[in-house]
UniProtKB/Swiss-Prot annotation:
MF terms (GO), sorted A to Z: GTP binding; GTPase activity
PANTHER family: DEVELOPMENTALLY-REGULATED GTP-BINDING PROTEIN 2
Domain OBG-type G: 66-292
Protein name: Ribosome-interacting GTPase 1
Species the sequence originates in: Saccharomyces cerevisiae (strain ATCC 204508 / S288c) (Baker's yeast)
Family named by the database record: Belongs to the TRAFAC class OBG-HflX-like GTPase superfamily. OBG GTPase family.
Localisation: Cytoplasm
Domain TGS intervals: 292-368
GO cellular component term of the entry, any: peroxisome
UniProt keywords, alphabetically: Acetylation, Cytoplasm, GTP-binding, Nucleotide-binding
Binding site for GTP: 72-79, 118-122, 250-253
Biological processes, Gene Ontology terms: cytoplasmic translation; positive regulation of cellular response to amino acid starvation
Note: Present with 11700 molecules/cell in log phase SD medium.
Length: 369
């Protein structure tokens, strides 16, 4: 583990010393690719157990339809926020390193059961295996949404450190995968096409990165103005995690109105005061929007719909088959068709099959054989 960390440090030092220009672009491309491979090595050893794994007390049994991880430095108010939202008591105090294990809680919001995980305070250097940060990050990667909780008295400083740590282990916040297609070939060399001008990336850098990954023949199609980091992300796709995140700017009760107005300009941010219960409703609504959950109401044949207890599905898994499996797996075996009311169908109601994609607040009657 220490050898990998030392190699990473050596490459970072060399990159810092190297001035970027046309003559050095090939060399810098190779260094960036080497760095990405070493970071993957570090992450793999941390998650497999040779470097500590998730660790006792870090990972917890999952429950609910989605999970939200609380990430932040010690004593920014994570434990207080968890307690206010879920009623779960996590030890909270005004000194650092209070929470030493992952503390789970559950909130029921708009009929959905959502698990919230108060992770131990992430610290600078976590991406290099220092402290307990790598175990915290291993759990954070498995969440559906991250609350990056910041103290408003020093938001930008801590925000930049946390983003750097998460970037270093392959977590991409509020981003989508780069639109780059790579098709490997047996021969013919590297051919590069682009549908938009590439203002951040030259052919030398592209060939250097591909060479480092031992890919000598491939067709590469750029459909976005990519950087060398974007190209590496596509090559390292299996170790990348694209996650929505909300920057929770806590302790706003210490600010003036003018200062508060400035905070609202930060993208993907929600200012709150967990201690004073300020703006928690807005935080939950933004959380709901970012989780992209779908509520489906059941309507037994010949009865009125049950609007009190929806079946909640993820937006990427919301077919009629997913709905049936959520209720009971035997429903799929006995399924004849479904009668759906709502925005997912043209006619009200309409008969559909198992592959039909449901939308939020549809009403469904399952008809058996």
């Amino acid at each position: 583990m220490s050898t990998t960390v030392e190699k990473i440090k050596a490459i970072e030092d060399e990159m810092a010393r190297t001035q970027k220009n046309k003559a050095t672009s090939f060399h810098l491309g190779q260094l960036k690719a080497k760095l990405a491979k070493l970071r993957r090595e570090l992450l793999t050893s941390a998650s497999s157990g040779s470097g500590g794994g998730a660790g006792i007390g870090f990972d917890v049994a999952r429950t609910g339809v989605a999970s939200v991880g609380f990430v932040g430095f010690p004593s920014v108010g994570k434990s207080t926020l968890l307690s206010k939202l879920t009623g779960t008591e996590s030890e909270a105090a005004e000194y650092e390193f209070t929470t030493l294990v992952t503390v789970p809680g559950v909130i029921r919001y708009k009929g959905a059961k959502i698990q919230m995980l108060d992770l131990p305070g992430i610290i600078d250097g976590a991406k290099d295996g220092r402290g307990r940060g790598k175990q915290v990050i291993a759990v954070a990667r498995t969440c559906n949404l991250l609350f990056i909780i910041l103290d408003v008295n020093k938001p930008l400083h801590h925000k930049q450190i946390i983003e750097k740590e998460l970037e270093g282990v392959g977590i991409r916040l509020n981003k989508t995968p780069p639109d780059i297609l790579i098709k490997k070939k047996e021969k013919g060399g590297i051919s590069i096409t682009n549908t938009v001008p590439l203002t951040h990336l030259g052919n030398d850098e592209i060939r250097a990165v591909m060479s480092e990954y031992r890919i000598n023949s491939a067709e590469i199609a750029f459909r976005c103005d990519a950087t060398v980091d974007d190209l590496i992300d596509v090559l390292e796709a299996s170790s990348r995690r694209y996650m929505p995140a909300i920057y929770v700017l806590n302790k706003i009760d210490s600010l003036s109105i003018e200062e508060l107005e400035l905070l609202y300009r930060i993208p993907n941010a929600v200012p709150i005061s967990s201690g004073q219960d300020w703006n928690l409703d807005e935080l939950l609504q933004v959380m709901w929007d970012r989780l992209n959950l779908v509520r489906i109401y059941t309507k037994p044949k010949g009865q009125i719909p049950d609007f009190t207890d929806p079946v909640v599905l993820r937006s990427d898994r919301c077919s009629v088959k997913d709905f049936c499996n959520q209720i009971h797996k035997s429903l799929v075996d006995d399924f004849r068709n479904a009668l759906v009311y709502g925005s997912s169908v043209k006619h009200q109601p309409q008969y559909v099959g198992l592959s039909h994609i449901l939308e939020d607040e549809d009403v469904v009657t399952i008809l058996k054989k």
